[in-house]
Amino acid sequence: MYVEDTIAAISTAAGEGGVGIVRVSGPDAPSIARRVFRRGSNGDFESHRFYYGSVVDAVTGEAVDEAMAVLMVRPRSYTREDVLEIQCHGGYLVTRRVLELVLAAGARLAEPGEFTRRAFLNGRIDLVQAEAVIDVIRAKTDAALALAQHQRQGRLSQRLDTVMAELRQALALVEAFIDFPEDDIDPAAQDALTVHVRKAAETVGELIAGFDEGRVLREGVAVLIAGKPNVGKSSLLNTLLQEKRAIVTSVPGTTRDIIEEVVNIRGLPLRMIDTAGIRDTEDIVEKEGVRLTLEKIPEADLVLLVIDGSRPLDEDDRMILSALAGKRLILVENKCDLPRAVQIPDELVLMPRVTVSTSRGDGIDELKESIFQTFIHGAAIDSREYVAVSRVRHRDLLSRSTMHLTAFEQGLASGFTLELLAVELRDALAAVGEVTGETTPDDILDVIFDRFCIGK
């Protein structure tokens, strides 16, 4: 339950820095400003104006730090409440001391995400926009940031609003039919009903179809580099990273541990996993590396299967293919700078394949493009118009809405009662409303906002 009290927290990262910010929100923010902040001029704080002065202990009168303070009078603030921000020096101890004085002056310590939760509860943003705030903070690539900013600015919410508008129109028609059962249903009204439902279903379907792309942009993907020893797996990792991260020698079995690094390909964050070469071996340490590799395979979204193009495939290659059965693969034929001796078997002919030379850098751009196109199918992710669902919560609720819309259309065709059809429309509308927060239970809100840091 939302309690209209006053909360406070440090909004900047812990540790040393140039500036530390203590944020206060609630009805007591103006009085707290007067108690803990001393400035040269007298009188009330003017809203949205920065003042220079000192943070003081209200009991002893001691100046704790020189600082800047700004009071933002509601509703023109992040939370739509009175908000005070004190900008002091960024040391760990001084910001903690300023926060303690603010708490002593009447505020309580904010819970994780409570400032953004208040912005949501006070109607400044919807739940999709609130969730986008944490995505902005955690974005690792420009594309992930752009997607998060689009959602924070309300692009996805606008699409969902059009869906709910269509469903409300449809529900209004059905309820009118129910209220006046003695009247024959006008064929034009029934056609309008069908149009409203199909428009809503089409938009929901488009959003669900874009989920996979949205998810990988927000979360990234795990790409495992697999193959037998000495085919160039570590060299491929180094080439993609453009640095010597993994040890490369001519001795088979050099890599015996798992190496993970992040690579950004056109805004797509990749968690690259370099693994030990897979083969039958009696070496105890190498055998442990092979075991770790096999354990990593299930968590990979994509496997780059590296083969040596200068040698024929052998039993080790076939054993690896068997271990990778059912995985999404790109066949990477390395060492194209040497005479080609490999023959691609029929079962691999249709597999995506890129020929590279890690020693010369040949084919690396083509490999990057192939990886990108595996997950992003031509979407203009840098476009101002790009909108995608990126959270499982959103996808599942939209899928539930689709289920009810499908049941509605089937029921309409089968002559179900209007009351039953109205139930399906209400349930479809409620599912979409839960995405934006119109109908979201408090326990779900707790889960969402608990993921935020304190101070946001």
Curated annotation (Swiss-Prot):
Pfam families: MMR_HSR1, MnmE_helical, TrmE_N. Gene3D superfamilies: P-loop containing nucleotide triphosphate hydrolases, Probable tRNA modification gtpase trme, domain 1, tRNA modification GTPase MnmE domain 2. (6S)-5-formyl-5,6,7,8-tetrahydrofolate binds at residues 23, 85, 124, 456. InterPro entries: G_TrmE, GTP-bd, GTP-bd_TrmE_N, GTPase_MnmE, MnmE_dom2, MnmE_helical, P-loop_NTPase, Small_GTP-bd. It is found in: Cytoplasm. One of its GO terms (molecular function) is GTPase activity. The keyword tRNA processing applies. SUPFAM superfamilies: P-loop containing nucleoside triphosphate hydrolases. GTP binds at residues 230-235, 249-255, 274-277. Exhibits a very high intrinsic GTPase hydrolysis rate. Involved in the addition of a carboxymethylaminomethyl (cmnm) group at the wobble position (U34) of certain tRNAs, forming tRNA-cmnm(5)s(2)U34. Homodimer. Heterotetramer of two MnmE and two MnmG subunits. This is tRNA modification GTPase MnmE.
